[in-house]
Amino acid sequence: MVNRKSHWEWGYGCLFSLWLLLGVVCSAKAANYDVNAFVTKWKPTGTQIVVPFESQNAQVRCYEANTTPVPAFGAAQKYSNDPKNNMCFKFSTTPNKTYILEIKGDIDKFSMSAPGGEVAQGTVNALLSIEQWGTGKWRNLNSAFANCINLEISSTTKGEPDLTLCEDLSYMFKGCSSLKIVDPQGKWKLQNVRTLLAMFEDCSQFNDPKIANWDIRNVETLNRTFCRATSFNVKIDNWEVGKVTNMSQTFQGCLNFKGEGLEKWATKVNRVTNFYCTFYGCKTLNFDPTDWNIESVTLITYMFYDCWLLGASKNLDFSNWAGKLKKVTSLSNLFTNCSNITGQGVEQWLLDKNHKIVSLESTFSGCKRFKADLTAWHVDNVENFYGLFNNCIEYDGKGIAKWKVGNAVSMGAMFRYCGNMKEDLKDWDVSKVKNFQGMFAYCPGLKTDFSKWDVGAGITFRKMFYGCSSFNGDLQNWDVSQSTDFYAMFFQCASFNADLSRWRMRSAINTSSMFSGCKAFNADISSWNVENVTDANAMFIGCEKFNANLSRWRFKNLQRMDNMFNGCKVFNADLRRWDVSHVK
């Protein structure tokens, strides 16, 4: 990312303030602005407008709109009595009247986000429009009009800014929620600009087609340029992005951005190291990125998160990305909720044993058409598998039985909603896994043999087999002594009736809904140590056959037991010795 100067650093120049008393002589005649001046229109609600800029040679005049004759330009004078030390001009105004401000000369710095707080107390909302750009040279437009929510540039705005000395347009229009266009004539020259960091961030109405031909050949940072510009859908495939290194969050939240023509960037993005959230939330994005040269990338997480239509027009083959992920350590959420991605070509991605990837969290989560054969993937170094295949409803797990997952720490939700899951994972080494939460939730046909799994490191088994209606696996040798959370572990496992008598439950705190809906369950769990359990709410609800003798259970701090045995038609254990004094 290109370094950005603080709002407190203004470089050089003098600090001025000019107080102009305004006449109220009005005329219907339109104002004739000085052709060299930067002209803006304001409508303040208070008694002054604060204009933060710095210049070596500026002359200014501020007057009520339609006033004739307009006052002469005044030489700005140093204002030294500002207790907040703001670098700004202040002009006296009458509330709710419209004013014209003309600034003539080169402007070294202009920022509506000046330090001290005065600007934020109302002036930003007073700026209505840029009437004319003038001929002065701009040196720094970082945050120039940031958060001016009423600012508009229209087809009648005269000229364009002289940016020959300007390298930084960061945050220039950030938060300008009324802004629709900026370059009505299509003549902005950006050849010397280095960064467009967050230039149009949160500009919810911005969609200027004239920026399509901007020459950004020297821009290095497109970080957050259009972030949350929800209306933006300009075809910018002609942009020269060959020097860009940072595209993180460039189009994040651009709900209407289709990415038309971005295939042309294929050979131009080879310097980009950061694709974090580039297209996050671009729900209508539908271009083919498979030929993009991503060989320099180090960060690619969330790149296509929630890109619902990606791959809708044709099946995307990502085989060209193979061998180009050598610097990446995480593929987390890369294609999350890309429901049209089949995974074609990704079979070739992780063939090198020495790759650096340690996280596959939710990489294909929500890819409902995903069915790639990942037999050849080396996942030896991966620690985080959380949600990897979550909601991949067509995925059958082909080939992953041979994966070496010995370094895995999290497998929560890994196969949630994988109704087609058929692969037998009995030989997986899960001895380091702490998080099994929802791992196989909503896999109604699950029948895998887990009897040899070493789950001794497990901290949470919450919802692990939630909704696995056919599951009745042998778990008697599982060491669950470290786990605190068993919430809904076997919820609606209608066939489950495994022997759990050996389970050591000394660390258990939450067993609520643990066997809820287990119609066949009647295992002997009378020897369980439940002294630390605080929540047993609905623990056996709907266990129609359950009648274990739980009279020896001892609770020290049981706080919830609502509906604990509701629907247990044959349960008749004597629970009079239970300590329920803490139950709320």
Give the predicted meaning of each segment.
Residues M1-W10:
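N-terminal secretory signal peptides that target proteins for export/translocation
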Residues G13-V25:
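Bacterial N-terminal signal peptides
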Residues A30-K584:
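Negatively charged
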